């Protein structure tokens, strides 16, 4: 029990920038490794399967991102409510909130698996996926969504740990399973010649292992954030609080992802080479947003704990500090990605047409950045 307590972090006192950075850095590294799941899939199929397979994986990115961002929205809701009770020192409600979060998570796993599997081909047709990559894209998504339970359990479980200030253990699990994903990708593709199905199976196996490790921490601990499978129940009052925070965040993420699906439908019109090039650069570009997402998660926990402790002024100061820190980090990373786009794209493929398409996308991205700075 003593060991478990050392993993929590009280953010209601101490240097605000230092606390935010200490909390955000493990999150940032963890987000990088979580994003590597799909990125590594693209690198492996691009180098060892072919351009059409790379285009198939790339064309599914917007759909898989939509599911990830939607789950993250609900995770934010749970983190805010649990963090508020942690900051207030209300251990009874905190424990109840954890039980409600996990009970709702198991129900969501069933609902979302059924929804995404049934809507799989519809989403690909909606994006006007070309016939020569449709079959492989559909296969990849079916396998991915059959194992989406692992993703949801990990995200919600790590959200509970983040609420009490523990970002290290979710990071450890994610690093280990990301390395495992790379190894399984190579084994399934090079040794067993499973093609695009191999990288999909590798991804869901790794996600289930990270989910199992996170669930084991929550079930086996004796600390205030523990839960027992036999004691799970839904507290409708707490669930309403979680949904009031999490649902708007989830909907906002889905709207953004859905707009990207419209863009993808136009890109698909130009064929596999353009699809692969744009898809590869978009995977690289996503890393620009990781510091913002990580700092937002850190700020969410910081604000929740301080509001719970009735330190509203400190909560406001934390919000301002997180914005300033995010802008500085994003500026540096964006510059590096734009300058070295060609080198980064060559990690995915040696196809010059794909690389040229990706470089064109990076130049347009530079213009977008300049416009935003001027505005």
Give the location of each predicted region:
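Signature of the first transmembrane helix
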Residues: 18-79, 83, 247-267
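Small-residue-rich hydrophobic transmembrane alpha-helices
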Residues: 54-114, 151-170, 278-341, 367, ...
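Membrane-interface helix-loop junctions in multi-pass transport and translocation proteins
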Residues: 178-212, 341, 356
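Helix-terminus/linker motif at the lipid-water interface of multi-pass membrane proteins
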Residues: 32, 36-55, 124-131, 187-194, ...
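Residue-level recognition of transmembrane alpha-helices
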Residues: 24, 58-61, 105, 141-144, ...
